[in-house]
Curated annotation (Swiss-Prot):
Pathway: Isoprenoid biosynthesis; isopentenyl diphosphate biosynthesis via DXP pathway; isopentenyl diphosphate from 1-deoxy-D-xylulose 5-phosphate: step 5/6
Gene behind this protein: ispG
Provenance organism: Thermotoga maritima (strain ATCC 43589 / DSM 3109 / JCM 10099 / NBRC 100826 / MSB8)
Function recorded in the entry: Converts 2C-methyl-D-erythritol 2,4-cyclodiphosphate (ME-2,4cPP) into 1-hydroxy-2-methyl-2-(E)-butenyl 4-diphosphate.
The name this protein goes by in its record: 4-hydroxy-3-methylbut-2-en-1-yl diphosphate synthase (flavodoxin)
Class in the EC hierarchy, top level: oxidoreductase
Cofactor names: [4Fe-4S] cluster
GO-annotated biological processes: isopentenyl diphosphate biosynthetic process, methylerythritol 4-phosphate pathway; terpenoid biosynthetic process
The organism's place on the tree of life at top rank: Bacteria
Gene Ontology MF terms in the entry: 4 iron, 4 sulfur cluster binding; 4-hydroxy-3-methylbut-2-en-1-yl diphosphate synthase activity (ferredoxin); 4-hydroxy-3-methylbut-2-enyl-diphosphate synthase activity (flavodoxin); iron ion binding
CC cofactor note: Binds 1 [4Fe-4S] cluster.
Length: 344
């Protein structure tokens, strides 16, 4: 079992569930915009949020931001040790630094500040911060992260979270497998510079999913260029798909010429309406009744299209026939029945 560390009220590692993180895209010193974005992330299910700290104004804004949010806040500092200390003084629940960019004395000061507040430090490496380069870049990546860990250990600091990321899926997997064998600290998973939309989702799902299936990884961030809320939604879906998080899974047929309903839009609408439900339930959206009910019989709840409407089925049993405009309303009714049954 991995060592556990506490980030605000969230435990990472040990027997704690895998947590979902994201990072704001706003200028941190713009408190109003930053808080607004964090609240959107909270509503999506984000459990830890990271902000970029590029100057004193950003560091000092942390205190005001924390007063208005519910989830732990991580300060991301690249070079200036003074910004790390100032972020800690202003209430950061964790800092992310690169100890290799600091002198021994400066690192001592940062460690002393973190110890004084009882907060952890995340260290690690990505392809842009590799200390040495050989033919095995994944190993160079992992060894660079281990060097960062050793620098903190030399200062007597052990509340550490480790991260090794590449934009390459296989490098990310190999580097994290190597790290997992070398240290007992919690591991932060992600694919850096993953790209936009489908590309980022595919890369992250493969790398993160593979590692979690091997019991490697304690907290995740799905990096997607653009709105960070999407990162949280995809991260939660990865955990639900792996059985590591309770939630509603919407399955849908790939569609063919027999489809009598707009499967894609119906599935999206159901996901949006039921994403908040924290129970392990499966909802099927099937285009027709020819194969739909049979293929969706493993679902707890489902809908199959008819030429002039749809049928609602629960655990493979048809409950009623409805017109298409009432599908969502009736699904909500049967979902509430299922939730009451689960609670009993």
């Amino acid at each position: 079992m991995r060592k556990s560390v506490k980030v605000g009220k969230v435990v990472i590692g040990g027997e704690a569930p895998v947590s979902v993180q994201s990072m704001t895209t706003t200028k941190t010193a713009d408190v109003e915009k930053t808080v607004s974005q964090i609240k959107s992330l909270e509503r999506a299910g984000c459990e830890i949020v990271r902000v970029a700290v590029q100057d004193e104004e950003d560091a000092k804004a942390i205190r005001r931001i924390k007063e208005q949010i519910e989830i732990p806040l991580v300060a991301d500092i690249q070079f200036d040790y003074r910004l790390a200390i100032l972020s800690i003084e202003n209430g950061a629940d964790k800092i992310r630094i690169n100890p290799g960019n600091m002198s021994r004395d400066r690192l001592k000061d940062v460690v002393a500040a973190a110890k004084g507040k009882g907060i952890p430090i995340r260290v690690g490496a990505n392809v842009g911060s590799i200390k040495r380069r050989t033919s095995e870049r994944w190993k160079d990546l992992a060894e660079s992260a281990l060097e960062e860990v050793r620098l903190l250990e030399k200062e007597g600091f052990y509340d550490i979270i480790v991260s090794v990321k590449s934009s390459d899926v296989l490098e990310t997997i190999k580097a994290n497998e190597y790290i997992a064998e070398k240290v007992e600290y919690p591991i932060h998973l992600g694919v850096t510079e993953a790209g936009v939309s489908e590309t980022a989702i595919v890369k992250s799902s493969i790398a993160i999913g593979h590692l979690l299936l091997k019991n490697i990884g304690d907290t995740i961030r799905v990096s997607i260029s653009g709105d960070p809320v999407r990162e949280v939604i995809v991260g939660k879906k990865i955990l639900i798909a792996l059985g590591l998080r309770e939630g509603v899974e919407v399955i849908a047929c790939p569609t063919c010429g027999r489809a009598e309903i707009d499967v894609e839009n119906m599935a999206k609408m159901i996901e949006e309406n039921f994403f908040h439900v924290q129970k392990r339930l499966k909802i099927a959206v099937m285009g027709c009744v020819v194969n739909g009910i049979g293929e969706g019989k493993d679902a707890d709840l489902g809908v199959a299209g008819l030429r002039d409407g749809a049928v609602i089925f629960v655990k493979g049993e048809i409950k009623e026939r409805v017109s298409k405009e009432f599908v969502l309303e009736r699904l909500k009714y049967y979902l509430n029945e299922l939730l009451e049954e689960v609670e009993r």
